[in-house]
Swiss-Prot record:
Residues that hold substrate according to the record: 99, 165, 212-216, 439-443
Organism: Pyrococcus abyssi (strain GE5 / Orsay)
Main function: Catalyzes the attachment of glycine to tRNA(Gly).
Coiled-coil features, chain-numbered ranges: none
Protein's name according to its UniProt entry: Glycine--tRNA ligase
Length: 571
């Protein structure tokens, strides 16, 4: 059985048969990239979300909720309208469309990440790659935006999109969130919700979906203060890293403590390292084995348009290899700067100094005597525009005047003599900055699948069961009368009701032999079966059977809730 056993196929059957998850819209033939969660799957999914939510709250992050549908302006500002695209190629004969980079990789075994549409078209022509569906000729590669487009109301001019990430809902609310945080950096805001990506040809089951759940945190911080105050608590935690250099030289992974990773320059600072450790701890708490987790640094051509550095927490799958489950992206001030520019809103934070500082500032204004006749009524407006410039913009203006002797503002050519330029000293108590952002971004659906895959276990005697982390089991306890006869059934049902009231996810089952029932609950990962047998009416004890060892202990009826809490939750 071991050699022929296909874990993926068995798991797909198990998920459908026992109520974990299955492809959506089955009765209409299904639709790729969409999955429904059944009763058991939805329970595990909620438990994953709960673990992540509780970890975020322990870090002091705030939770919000924002709409899935987002006006187009938001995604123009964020760069998604322009940049959130994948290369696509269409068959000239049958019209089937494929993701071009994936098709080339699957056909030739070469990585074309970062190559242009023209370069991929050339590769397809040179290697005579044909349509996988019909063998027809493929057209030129072009780009396809992955956002689902819609409209707000009955008006075609109010274009909107289903959000491809939850993050933008946080960024556009920054002013209110900063006020809630009392203008004090750093602070973190998260939300857990749906995101949508119109994948070209989603395959691999739950690994690549068009609708999926995310848990994203945006941590706003001062880029000049990147030492995490609690780093000492995690500095000895080990991380398995796969940095860019090792990927390019095929050197494999390295294992370092968080402190070593920072000192050796693999991780940019303790702030970044702290949250990488947080991600690892959450995955472990969900039940992902530590030896199946690594952190891979994305190559520059892989990174999203907003990222200066990204490390992915990847989990190993027997079917799919290393699968990205969580990303930690350094988004710099990209998003807030873009939204400031597009909306005109002030998304800065005032940073107060411990002591006032004397700083040199440029004071630039128009020489009204010189420009008055030239600019006439526009002189006042252009002067106000110059006064509103940042220090950086003023220095750039002066630099250009010094180098070229002139500058054009609103169509007017102005010389150096048209300006009054002074450098003055000022006492300042603080400065306005645009916060930078570090983003831990969790998928929920991939960890769900990988938790099940890594939990699926075959004993030496051929027993197949889910060795899922006990507090992650979709059914925590099964109460089983040995036979369906009084008084065993009444005692069993009363215990079942008691456990329900104590908050356990518990079932009562009296159908089939006790052996079949044990197998039934082993298969779905139920950690403990409580059996009411013929000894129970005599001495008031029951057996608690362990899923993994199949060992049984006898416990008094009144002690069952306490004992189960201890066994399942460690309390």
């Amino acid at each position: 059985m071991g050699e022929r056993f296909d874990k993926y196929e068995y798991l797909q059957d198990l998920m459908r048969r026992r109520g974990f998850a299955w492809g959506s819209f089955e009765i209409y033939g299904g639709s790729r990239g969409f999955y429904d969660y059944g009763p058991l799957g939805a329970t595990i999914k909620r438990k994953i979300e709960k673990k992540i939510r509780e970890a975020f709250i322990r870090e002091g992050f705030f939770e919000i909720e924002t709409p899935d549908i987002t006006p187009e302006q938001v995604f123009i500002a964020s760069g998604h309208v322009e940049k959130f695209v994948d290369p696509i190629v269409e068959c000239k004969k049958c019209g089937a469309r494929f993701r071009a980079d994936h098709l080339i990789e699957e056909t030739l075994g070469i990585d074309v990440e970062g190559k242009s549409a023209e370069e991929m078209t050339k590769i397809i022509r040179e290697h005579n790659i044909k349509c996988p569906e019909c063998g027809g000729e493929l057209g030129d590669v072009f780009y396809f935006n992955l956002m689902f487009e819609t409209y707000i109301g009955p008006y075609k001019d109010k274009k909107a999109y289903l959000r491809p990430e939850t993050a933008q809902g946080i960024f556009v609310n920054f002013k209110r969130l900063n006020a809630f945080a009392r203008n004090k950096l750093p602070f973190g805001v998260f939300q857990i919700g749906k995101a949508y990506r119109n994948e070209i040809s989603p395959r691999q089951g739950m690994i690549r979906l068009r609708e999926f759940t995310q848990a994203e945190v945006e941590i706003f911080f001062n880029p000049n203060e990147t030492e995490h105050p609690h780093f000492d608590e995690v500095k000895h935690e080990k991380l398995r890293l796969y940095p860019i250099e090792n990927q390019l030289k095929d050197l494999g992974m390295i294992e370092l403590t968080a402190e070593e990773a920072v000192k050796k320059g693999y991780l940019m600072n303790t702030f970044f390292a702290y949250y990488l450790v947080m991600i690892k701890k959450i995955l472990l708490d969900i039940g992902i084995p530590e030896d199946k987790i690594r952190f891979r640094q994305q190559l520059p051509e892989e990174r999203a348009h907003y990222s200066a550095d990204t490390w992915d927490a990847e989990v190993y799958s027997e079917r799919f290899g290393w699968v990205e489950c969580v990303g930690l992206a350094y988004r710099t001030d990209y998003d807030l700067s873009r939204h400031m520019k597009m909306s005109g809103a002030d998304l800065t934070v005032m940073i107060h100094y411990d002591k006032p500082k004397i700083v040199k500032r440029l004071k630039v204004s128009l020489n009204m005597k010189s420009v008055g006749p030239k600019l006439k009524k526009d002189a006042k407006r252009i002067n106000e525009k110059i006064q509103a410039m940042s220090e950086e913009e003023l220095r750039e203006l002066v630099k250009k005047l010094n180098e070229e002797g002139k500058i054009v503002i609103d169509g007017y050519e102005l010389s150096k003599d048209d300006f009054i330029i002074k450098e003055v000293e000022e006492k300042v108590t603080g400065e306005k900055i645009i916060p930078h952002v570090l983003e831990p971004s969790f998928g929920i659906d991939r960890p769900f699948y990988l938790l099940l895959e890594n939990s699926l276990t075959i004993d030496e005697d051929g027993r197949i069961y889910l060795k899922i982390k006990k507090d992650m089991a979709p059914i925590e306890v099964a109460v089983l009368p040995l036979v369906a006869k009084e008084p065993l059934t009444k005692i069993a049902y009363d215990l079942f009701r008691k456990l329900q009231k104590e908050g356990f996810i518990v079932v009562y089952d009296e159908k089939d032999s006790i052996g079949k029932r044990y197998m039934r609950y082993d298969e779905i990962g139920t950690p403990y079966c409580v059996t009411i047998d013929n000894q129970t009416p005599i001495d008031g004890t029951v057996t608690i059977r362990d899923r993994d060892t199949r060992e049984q202990i006898r416990v008094k009826l009144e002690d069952v809730p306490r004992k189960l809490k201890e066994l399942i939750f460690g309390s």
